[in-house]
Amino acid sequence: MARVAVICPDLLFGSNVEGALRAAGHEVTRYDDAAGVDSPDVLVVDLNEVDAAPLPGVPSVGFYRHTDVDTRRRAEDAGYDMVVPRSRMARETAALVERALLR
């Protein structure tokens, strides 16, 4: 079980991400922005809604709207470990977080 910080102000999508991670046995804390995020094992960020840099030493998964190539590039340049389209995040939430933990 990992402590996962999910920064996603979208109530519906954030709840889906949180539910999938809890079902996989992870402890999840949701945030609307980066303020207050405190030493998680993994960071998950909605890149279209939040301007949050990855945390040093913390595996990070960012997701974006598939049409927003600029956001993907900025996240990769910022150092996110994994940057995936929102649709993939919806399908593979737990698997992506577990893969990030292996990095």
Where do the protein language model's features map onto the residues?
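Short, charged N-terminal beta->alpha structural module
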Residues: 1-32
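Short, polar loop motifs at secondary-structure junctions
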Residues: 11-12, 31-35, 47-51, 67-68
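Short, structured coil segments at secondary-structure junctions
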Residues: 24, 56, 78-80
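A short, hydrophobic beta-strand element within the central beta-sheet of small alpha/beta folds
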Residues: 58-67
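Alpha4 helix (beta4-alpha4-beta5 surface) of REC/receiver domains from two-component response regulators
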Residues: 67-82
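Receiver (REC) domain switch/output surface
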Residues: 95-103
